[in-house]
Amino acid sequence: MPTYSTRARIALSLLAAAGLAAAALATSPIASAATNPAKYEKAQVGLTYTVYAPTTSIELKRSSFQLIDCGGGKDEQLIASFGSQMSNSGWINLNESQTGCLDGPDGVGLVTKFKVKGATATIKGSCKGQVSSCSKSNPARLRKGSGYTTVTLPAGSSALKSTFVEVYTAGMSVKDIKEFVSGLEPVQ
């Protein structure tokens, strides 16, 4: 059995405690309540952009819900996930902010555009051969790989601003993505 110094034992204890804390957070009601409208309504307080809550999760189990710092004096960004990137049943990651917090992914090309709440949503899918950029992709690559959808949805009231929405997906069809994005409703 190896002998550890006092510092090493303390470091190992802290790592173990951090792991237990992370596991507790992952199974907490906050993490598992992503489709609960009350979570979205509560998140709206203090934000200047309109928070949109999904009315469907395309039968994917909710997996997380959080507000994170967007930096640069911007409002916090809302992030909610459904399903798992590691499963074959699909994954959706919803990001809402006043403007994009991060650049979108590389290696995606246009699949289609559609209208939602008067705005144009753009669905992009994985590029053939996993190249860093392409002008077009197709629904089959979207379904087998990853997707990235963006739309700026209108303000829910005159007191709020419009919302930049990014939807990252894995293993989802164009129909699924359209259903999810079209089902986003402003909280009251």
Report residues per predicted region:
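C-terminal region of N-terminal signal peptides and the immediate post-cleavage residues
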Residues: 1-6, 11, 20-43
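Charged/polar, solvent-exposed surface patches and flexible loops
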Residues: 10, 45, 179-183
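Hydrophobic alpha-helical membrane segments, chiefly transmembrane helices and signal peptide h-regions
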Residues: 13-28, 146-154
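A generic alpha-helix preference that emphasizes hydrophobic side chains
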Residues: 17, 30, 57-58, 181
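A broad, low-specificity signal marking well-ordered, structured residues that form hydrophobic/aromatic
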Residues: 31, 80, 165
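Short, solvent-exposed recognition patches
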Residues: 35-161
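Surface-exposed amphipathic alpha-helical segments
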Residues: 161-188
